[in-house]
Amino acid sequence: MHFVSIDLASKMAWIKSRATLGEIYHGTSQVTSEYGFPIGVGPTVGSGGHFKGGEYGLLSRKYGTSFDNVLDVHHVDAQGRLLDRASMREDVFWALRGGGAGTWGIIVAQKIQLVSVTPRVTAFCLSKIGKGAISELLYRWQAIAPKAPPELFSTVYVAGFTKGNVTDIQASFYRQYLGTTVETLALMGKIYPELELSAMDCKEGKWIEAVAFIADV
């Protein structure tokens, strides 16, 4: 993993822009199960554009966006100079934190802050069918989501389908919780019983295993 260099002593890593998100996940998991990073789950997505767009990940509710956790960059400007945070203006570094891929120059590497993850992490995907049921679940979640603990990541994918002469919609609810299955069931039973989550729907393991489950790899 020559595109990802981890320093556990400082809880930091240097990521070359050529690295994919999958390589970041893999490189980190080979060194530690105690730390992760708030990035997306597309394993083939390039980290350079991902970081420069700001981007949101499974740990973002607790730790912020990807670039909220970038501490330094190696950046080539319009004059061909290779700059780091110390040698560029601070407003340029600020602009690089989510200002858009390629807008301010070329980022060749970024120094990131690793963030703590729990020893056990639970993920689940639960599908529901039916316009009425899904409408009620989504309406309910709008009231719950802002108050949910930051350890809980959630997203839902809604798509239409046709089976025979019947056209309907299906919603897939994806969640990741920094905790055990028992803790996840207790939380969801308290704040979102309408989802009817059961232990059979959950997969508990290390953080990287939860990421792989949600990414479906």
Regions found by a protein language model. Give the residues of each.
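C-terminal cap/substrate-recognition region of VAO/PCMH-type FAD-linked oxidoreductases
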Residues: V73-V217
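FAD-binding glycine-rich core of flavoenzymes that anchor FAD
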Residues: M1-A95, W104, A133-E151
